[in-house]
């Protein structure tokens, strides 16, 4: 069976939404019964985004196999059913690292190592190797056509048409068609120049997807078709919409999936997008609104919490409520009035993070939620600060802290993971990184099994006793100090396979106060939601009703 390759590039400006378009197209092709996967090619020289600042790069998306990847992989998993792995994200840094290792081993037999053929051959081999079991591989090329960083990737995908046959390769170019308000015109010239730039590299796009503030009319499509040498049927108008989950429907309405199937000579049934129609319907017809506060330290760039934001919206869909999100800088809570800043919230969520900055503000938010019976959801560090707060103010451990912040505190209720060996059979896997900064030396990454206590609120929401969730942390609850905390009313309701780690906590004397060491947001999708997020939003709705009633 031949694999069909679809390459998606972007031009004119960055941030046009290549990831959303790629994922949306993949979802439509998947709905036609095709086995689909996506690979993101990133031009940055970092090996992975694991140590990049969330304020600069956005969130790090964790795959089931423990890879720290680009946030676009989160989009892919939310749109299609195929789970991403470390092989679905390839960076320039990873490529160069592998090429240099091969050179040092002598694999190139003394050849002068160059971009062409060695780097481009590595890229092509990566794509071919990791797409063998699929009908269609979509490849999103990061960056913008014309950037020097993207040239090796563009050369590699140009060569793919020769290596795997032009009939099994298709090039999609995403461009901007700006609207000039003074003249009331859509301008196609930037698109023409972007295609010209792509042609200079040797790539003739087969499909143009044109982003704009307005619907691109018939005359503009004819003009783009003529000057860019692309069929008019293959000029797709993609105007701004209020929901990214409308994109699959918009692509299907313009016949893009049918055009692609005919191009590849694929005989498959029409896509059934009824589930996406339901998502959009629920989004457009909410029964009410709840307000959730996200207390974080990276709020200058909300993409740092992309999966959390999406998971909250998914939970809103399942509850038929619109979720209004308020971002609260954790540092501000340390100096300003907590009551004023958190007033009017129906629920408080504290997401993950690293480092001491803003931690005391997060602790104050957990205390405020606990004392005022406001639904609280702590994720990773958010769980840890909830435990620290409870230990300090309920148990009486005034000096309680994490050894991440205070190494010699009297009550290290959160301490570094130590003494466990890395295994490959899901027994509390610890990833040991050699020759890197100490901050990543003992990171627990990827999907792990968790056993839930029967009858707990968490177990009732999941509806089962064994779950698999994704982790990214190197500090854990100190079991030796937890018994006293649990006796005071903060229970451990989820444990790792060998009971080495407490993964979930619940506050007994609170309507909904839950902390998870794992990151449930990475398993949430618009069509299914996630049990913890759905339960959290439901609790926020109940809290709102209670406040209104009183």
From Swiss-Prot:
Instruction: Give the disulfide map.
Output: none
Q: Which reaction does it catalyse?
A: UTP + L-glutamine + ATP + H2O = CTP + L-glutamate + ADP + phosphate + 2 H(+); L-glutamine + H2O = L-glutamate + NH4(+); UTP + NH4(+) + ATP = CTP + ADP + phosphate + 2 H(+)
Q: What is its EC number?
A: 6.3.4.2
Pathway assignment reads:
Pyrimidine metabolism; CTP biosynthesis via de novo pathway; CTP from UDP: step 2/2
Characterize the regulation of its activity: Allosterically activated by GTP, when glutamine is the substrate; GTP has no effect on the reaction when ammonia is the substrate. The allosteric effector GTP functions by stabilizing the protein conformation that binds the tetrahedral intermediate(s) formed during glutamine hydrolysis. Inhibited by the product CTP, via allosteric rather than competitive inhibition.
Q: Where does L-glutamine bind?
A: 353, 381-384, 404, 474
Alphabetical keyword list: ATP-binding, Glutamine amidotransferase, Ligase, Magnesium, Metal-binding, Nucleotide-binding, Pyrimidine biosynthesis
Q: Which Pfam families match?
A: CTP_synth_N, GATase
The record's CDD domains line, in alphabetical order, gives: CTPS_N, GATase1_CTP_Synthase
Q: Where do the annotations place UTP binding?
A: 14, 187-192, 223
Amidoligase domain: annotated span: 1-266
Q: Where does ATP bind?
A: 15-20, 72
**Record-level Gene Ontology MF annotations:** ATP binding; CTP synthase activity; glutaminase activity; identical protein binding; metal ion binding
- Which Gene Ontology biological process is one annotated for this entry? pyrimidine nucleobase biosynthetic process
Q: Is the keyword Coiled coil in the record?
A: no
- Show where the Glutamine amidotransferase type-1 domain sits: 291-546
Quote the record's binding site residues for Mg(2+).
72, 140
Q: What class of enzyme is it?
A: ligase
Residues that, per the record, bind CTP: 14, 147-149, 187-192, 223
The similarity annotation says:
Belongs to the CTP synthase family.
Which miscellaneous remark does the UniProt record hold? CTPSs have evolved a hybrid strategy for distinguishing between UTP and CTP. The overlapping regions of the product feedback inhibitory and substrate sites recognize a common feature in both compounds, the triphosphate moiety. To differentiate isosteric substrate and product pyrimidine rings, an additional pocket far from the expected kinase/ligase catalytic site, specifically recognizes the cytosine and ribose portions of the product inhibitor.
PANTHER family from the xrefs?
A: CTP SYNTHASE, CTP SYNTHASE-RELATED
The record's note on quaternary structure and interaction partners says:
Homotetramer.
Q: What does this protein do?
A: Catalyzes the ATP-dependent amination of UTP to CTP with either L-glutamine or ammonia as the source of nitrogen. Regulates intracellular CTP levels through interactions with the four ribonucleotide triphosphates.
Its name, as the record gives it, is CTP synthase
Q: Which gene encodes it?
A: pyrG
């Amino acid at each position: 069976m031949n694999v069909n390759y679809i390459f998606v590039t972007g031009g004119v400006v960055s941030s046009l939404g290549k990831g959303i378009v790629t994922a949306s197209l993949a979802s439509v092709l998947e709905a036609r019964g095709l086995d689909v996967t996506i690979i993101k090619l990133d031009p940055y020289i970092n090996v992975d985004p694991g140590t990049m600042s969330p304020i600069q790069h956005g969130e790090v998306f964790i795959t089931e196999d423990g890879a720290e990847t680009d946030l676009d992989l989160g989009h892919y998993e939310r749109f299609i059913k195929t789970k991403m792995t470390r092989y679905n994200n390839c960076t320039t840094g990873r490529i160069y690292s592998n090429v240099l290792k091969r050179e040092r081993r002598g694999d190139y037999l003394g050849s002068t190592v160059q971009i062409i053929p060695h780097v481009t051959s590595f890229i092509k081999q990566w794509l071919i190797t990791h797409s063998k079991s699929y009908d269609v591989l979509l490849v999103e090329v990061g960056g913008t056509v014309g950037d020097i960083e993207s040239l090796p990737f563009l050369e590699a995908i140009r060569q793919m048409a020769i290596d795997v046959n032009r009939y099994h390769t298709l090039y999609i170019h995403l461009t901007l068609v700006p609207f000039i308000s003074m003249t009331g015109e859509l301008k196609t010239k930037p698109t023409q120049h972007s295609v010209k730039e792509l042609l200079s590299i040797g790539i003739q796009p087969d499909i143009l997807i044109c982003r704009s503030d307005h619907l691109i009319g018939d005359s503009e499509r004819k003009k783009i078709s003529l000057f860019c040498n692309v069929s008019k049927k293959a000029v797709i108008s993609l105007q701004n919409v209020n929901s990214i989950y409308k994109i699959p429907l918009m692509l299907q309405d313009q016949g893009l999936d049918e055009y692609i199937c005919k191009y590849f000579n694929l005989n498959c049934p029409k896509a059934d997008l009824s589930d996406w129609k339901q998502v959009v319907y629920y989004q457009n017809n909410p029964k009410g609104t709840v307000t959730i506060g996200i207390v974080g330290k990276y709020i200058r760039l909300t993409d740092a919490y992309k999966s959390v934001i999406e998971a909250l919206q998914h939970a809103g869909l399942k509850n038929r409520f619109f979720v209004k999100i308020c971002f609260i800088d954790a540092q501000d809570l340390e100096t300003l009035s907590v009551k004023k800043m958190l007033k009017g919230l129906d629920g408080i969520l504290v997401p993950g993070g690293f480092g001491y900055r803003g931690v005391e503000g997060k602790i104050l938010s957990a205390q405020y939620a606990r004392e005022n019976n406001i639904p609280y959801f702590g994720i990773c560090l958010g769980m840890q600060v909830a435990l620290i707060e409870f230990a300090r103010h309920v148990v009486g451990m005034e000096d309680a802290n994490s050894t991440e912040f205070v190494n010699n505190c009297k009550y290290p209720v959160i301490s570094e993971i130590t003494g466990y060996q890395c295994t490959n059979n899901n027994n509390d896997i610890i990833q040991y990184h050699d020759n890197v900064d100490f901050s990543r030396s003992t990171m627990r990454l990827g999907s792990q099994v968790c056993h839930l206590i029967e009858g707990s609120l968490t177990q009732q929401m999941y509806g089962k006793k064994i779950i698999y969730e994704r982790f990214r942390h190197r500090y854990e609850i100190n079991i030796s100090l937890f018994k006293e905390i649990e006796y005071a009313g903060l229970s451990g309701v989820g444990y790792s396979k060998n009971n080495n780690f407490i993964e979930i906590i619940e506050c007994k004397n609170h309507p909904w106060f839950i902390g998870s060491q794992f990151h449930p947001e990475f398993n949430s999708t618009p069509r299914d939601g996630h049990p913890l997020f759905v339960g959290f939003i439901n609790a926020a709705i109940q809290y709102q009703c209670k406040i209104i009633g009183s």
